[in-house]
Amino acid sequence: VATWIGKSGRTLVYGGSRAGLMETLATTVRENGGRVIGVVPQAVVNRDLVSDASTTVFYTADLQDRKSTFMRESEAFVALPGGIGTLDEVFTVLAAKTLEKYKRRVVLYNAGGCWDELIKMIDTLSANGLITERREDLLSVANNIEELERLLSE
């Protein structure tokens, strides 16, 4: 994913921390010619975890401000396999999308079936009328890099 982002001249907008998998992603994007925007909450600054991989950095007061900056600065939202923070970001973006405050493409990169249960849950919520939107209208699913490339090129 990172190599494709960089080589296709795209920009990665991410949390700006040097911890974890996203640091590797950011470094690889940059090594392959892409821009990297780090959106760094004060908590990351306080823990001295700010990455050097970013070409541009936005500092935010907190996680809510960070998510708002993600949405403002991004052309699309792609969720790679992740944990609680990723789920928080996914649901924040989907909630904004249902209120028509975020109109860009949302993609779950479903590597190894990571998002299968979440996809089923959203389909069930929609089928039961608990959310009015169909999943297909809220988000797309890419099961491999070719599908991700196609979705982001549309």
Segment roles from a protein language model:
Residues 39-77:
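Glycine-rich oxoanion-binding loops at beta->alpha junctions
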